Amino acid sequence: MAGVKLQERAAVVGIGISNMALIRYLVARGVRVTACDRTSAEKLGERAAELARLGVPLVAGEGYLEPLADHDLIFLTPGMPKHLPEIEAARRRGAAISGEIGLVLDLCRAPVIGVTGSAGKTTTTTLIGEILRAAGRETYVGGNIGKPLIEQVEAIPSEAVVVLELSSFQLQLVHRSPHIAVVTNVSPNHLDVHATMEEYVEAKKAIFRRQSPADWLVLNADDPTVRAFAAEARSRVVLFSRRADPGGRDAAFVREDRVIWRRGGRETPILFLDEIRLPGLHNQENVLAAVAACFLAGAPLSAVREVVTQFTGVEHRIEPVRVLDGVKWYNDSKATSPAEAVAALTTLPAPIVLIAGGSDKGIPFDPIAPLVAEKVKTLILMGPTAPKIEEAVRRGGYAGPIRRAADMAEAVALAREAAAPGDTVLLSPACASFDAYRNFEERGRHFKSLVEALS
C-alpha cells in the first residue's frame, strides 16, 4: 500500500498525546476530524476541552467506533487491537488505516533510522540519536519515545536524520519502511493485544517489508528469530553479535573483548568492552546495534567512541536510585516483559530483593524462574499477575520467601524490611503498569519517590 493521502474527513481513534498532536496537524490543514475514544468526555478532561476549542466533534464511551463506518481515512492509536469488528469492516471496504507515526514516515523528507525489538529499543534509539548529534548531524528522535514528531515533520530538512523507536503496534500502522532498520531481538510480548506470537513477529517484520535494495537492515545474529529475517529482506543486511563473528562483508561484533566494525570486508577496532559504561550483556548488544546503524549513517569513529564511553543509560532502565544502609536500590520499571526482567537480573549481583508484578500481557513468566531461583533472596509481588509469577517461579525451583504487596508503597516497605547491607533491591516488574499507573514512567517515578523518602 502506498502512503496515506489526506482527505477532507478523517476519524482519529484514541485521544492520547500523539493523536492529539495528529489532530492539531490535521485540523491546521483543513481536514474535518472526528475524534473517537472509549473513555468518557468527563474523564478525558482537558483533551476533550481542547477538541471543543478546535471544533472537533468527540464520540466517546460506548459506540465510540461507530463513526468508522462512514470515514475512508482512519487513524488508530497504536495499542488498540486491530481485529475489532468495526476496524475489520472499514478495512474490507477499502478505508485507509494508519497511525500518527505512519503519517510521519509518509511525510518525512529526511532519512529515517527505525529501531524495533522486544527489549533494548529505547536504549538503542537514544544511543543512536546521541551519537549522530555528537557527529554534528541535525537529529530528531521520536516514535515510541519523546514528543510526537507529526507537528514538526514538514519542517525537518532533508539533510537531517530522524531516529524512531517503533513498537509492534506502531509498525502495524505504517506503509513505509525506514532507510536503516534495526531489530534488537524478539521474544514473547504484548500477547494481550496481538492475537498470536506469529502476528507479533509479523508486525516486527513491517520495519523492513517495504525497504528497497538501497536500504539497510541491521539484525541481531544471536537471536535465531531475528537472524531468520535476513532471508526475507530485499535490503542490504548487516548482522551484529556479541558472541562471535557473524560473517558477511558488513558486521559489528566482539572479538577478544573488543568491539569491531567491518564495512566492505575492512575491519576497524572501535573500543574495548570495559570502556562501555552501560551495564549488562544485553547492553553490549544495544551498543553493537547502535554502532552499526551510526556507521551506516555516516558517523565518524570519534563520535561513536565519545558517546559510547560516556553514556550511562536512560531513566527506568536498571537506573540506580540510591544506596541506603549498604543496600543498593534500582529502578527498572521499563521491564514490562519477562525478557527485560531477565536482563536486569542477569546484570545485577545477588542477593536481590525483587519487586515484580503488574498488569497481564498474556506472556508466560517461566523465563524469569531460573534467575529468581539463583539470585533472588526475597520476592515481593503485586498486581493481578502475582499468582501467575508465584506459580512460575515455584515451578522453576525458587524456594525463598514470597511476600504480597497491595501497592508500591507496601512493596517498598517490605523490601526495606527484607534487605540487608550488601543486598540489591530491584524493581523489575516483568509486567505492564496499567493496573495501577498510566505508564511505566509514572510507576518508576513513584517507586523512586518512595525510595528517596526512606530514612
Swiss-Prot record:
UniProt key word Cell division: yes
EC top class named in words: ligase
Gene Ontology cellular component terms for the protein in this record: cytoplasm
Record keyword Cell wall biogenesis/degradation present: yes
EC code: 6.3.2.9
A biological process term (GO) from this entry: cell wall organization
GO molecular function, one term: UDP-N-acetylmuramoylalanine-D-glutamate ligase activity
Pathway: Cell wall biogenesis; peptidoglycan biosynthesis
Pfam families registered for this protein in UniProt: Mur_ligase_C, Mur_ligase_M, MurD-like_N
Record keywords: ATP-binding, Cell cycle, Cell division, Cell shape, Cell wall biogenesis/degradation, Cytoplasm, Ligase, Nucleotide-binding, Peptidoglycan synthesis
Compartment(s) where it occurs, according to its Swiss-Prot or TrEMBL record: Cytoplasm
Chief location of this protein within or outside the cell: cytoplasm
Catalytic activity: UDP-N-acetyl-alpha-D-muramoyl-L-alanine + D-glutamate + ATP = UDP-N-acetyl-alpha-D-muramoyl-L-alanyl-D-glutamate + ADP + phosphate + H(+)
Lineage top rank: taxon: Bacteria
Binding site for ATP: G117, S118, A119, G120, K121, T122, T123
Biological function: Cell wall formation. Catalyzes the addition of glutamate to the nucleotide precursor UDP-N-acetylmuramoyl-L-alanine (UMA).
Family: Belongs to the MurCDEF family.
Protein name: UDP-N-acetylmuramoylalanine--D-glutamate ligase
Species, as recorded: Symbiobacterium thermophilum (strain DSM 24528 / JCM 14929 / IAM 14863 / T)
Taxonomy of the source species: Bacteria, Bacillati, Bacillota, Clostridia, Eubacteriales
